[in-house]
Amino acid sequence: MALPLLNYAPKSQNVRVEGYEIGSEEKPVVFTTENILSSSDMDNLIEAAYRQIFFHAFKWDREKVLESQLRNGQITVRDFVRGLLLSNTFRNSFYEKNSNYRFVEHCVQKILGRDVYSEREKIAWSIVVATKGYQGLIDDLLNSDEYLNNFGYDTVPYQRRRNLPGREAGELPFNIKSPRYDAYHRRQLGFPQIVWQNEVRRFIPQEKKLTAGNPMNFLGMARSINPAANTIPKVSAQNINIEASVPRR
């Protein structure tokens, strides 16, 4: 029997405050199947879903079957997002490379479009991972009232209210704020590190290069000379033999 979700109190984040600003280019672009007018619009929607879930999808990461089903109207955007979340790429990149707490943070950001409210919410969803498993957490987040009220079945999730008026910089994008791997796995993979295998040479302009006969060419040789000093040994007065030192007449 699965444990009920642990209660946690939401806090007044930006996503819980209704926006009153005039629409501008800073507002996030909403991709939904309700205003698809051409095949290029569907391509943009699919790319937006890949960016939201994977941040960057390579050619071998793409789910061609799910894309075809979405284009033909066999599945909704919510089903397409669910398929990406349950794919091997997402599982290998986020679930297997992070702890349950870190994985919960990634899922809340990517699915609900916000940060976790507190450590208590992080613990609550991590209990779901422990009791219902990896797929159980994905289903519970997609079936939650918060997801359905904000994105429904036809809208790609996005980071809600990242840019705010009156501030020079808004909230950081989730892909920068929360890297794919935590610090432990980044150390396992050996980065960040700098490996420099080439010889470091100093660039000298042509007009400053030394020509033949320039005394500066011999500066290195002069510095390398270490002449031995001719030191005079010190003799104590008590060790001087006066009788032996005075010549005989």
From Swiss-Prot:
UniProt keyword list: Antenna complex, Membrane, Phycobilisome, Thylakoid
Compartments where located: Cellular thylakoid membrane
GO cellular component: phycobilisome; plasma membrane-derived thylakoid membrane
Top-rank lineage group of the source organism: Bacteria
Membrane topology: Peripheral membrane protein
Transmembrane segments: none
Database matches in InterPro entries: PBS_linker_dom, PBS_linker_sf, Phycobilisome
Protein family according to the UniProt entry: Belongs to the phycobilisome linker protein family.
Protein name: Phycobilisome rod-core linker polypeptide CpcG
Native source species: Synechocystis sp. (strain ATCC 27184 / PCC 6803 / Kazusa)
